[in-house]
Amino acid sequence: MQLKKKKFESKISLSKDARDGILSFCKMNHPNEGILILRGKAKRGNVFIDGLVVPPFSETGADFAGFPHNPLPLDPSYVGIVHSHPVGSAEPSLTDLNNFFGLVSMIVKSPYEDDDIFAWDSDGKEIPLVVV
C-alpha cells in the first residue's frame, strides 16, 4: 500500500520581537553578511518564529555567512536560518540553497527595513511571510 503525503501550503509567521532582532543584527553586521538560527514551532506547513540564536563558530564576510552544523545541540525548536545580503537581491543563491538548514531560509536585503525580509523553501520558492 502506498501512502500519499499531504502537501500543505506553507506560511511563515514572525513575531515582532524576532523581526526587530533580525533587522538590528543585520544592521550591526553591515557591510558583512550576518547569520542567525531561527527558533520556533512548525505545524502543517505553518512555521511560527519567535526566537533567534547566534550560531556557535559562525564565520561571516562581505559575501558569505555560515556555521558548522555538527556542534549544534539537537534542538527541535530550530526551524531554519536567516542571513543578510548586504548587496543585491534577497533571492537565494545556489550556495544558499545547498546550505539550507531546517524548514525555512530567510534572507534580508539592505537597507534592512521591515519590507526587506523574505522567506524561502528548500527549492528556492518564496513562502508568504507575516509579522504578528
Regions found by a protein language model. Name each.
Residues 81:
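Conserved, mostly hydrophobic/aromatic
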Residues 1-78, 86-132:
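Conserved beta-strand-loop surface patch within small alpha/beta domains used
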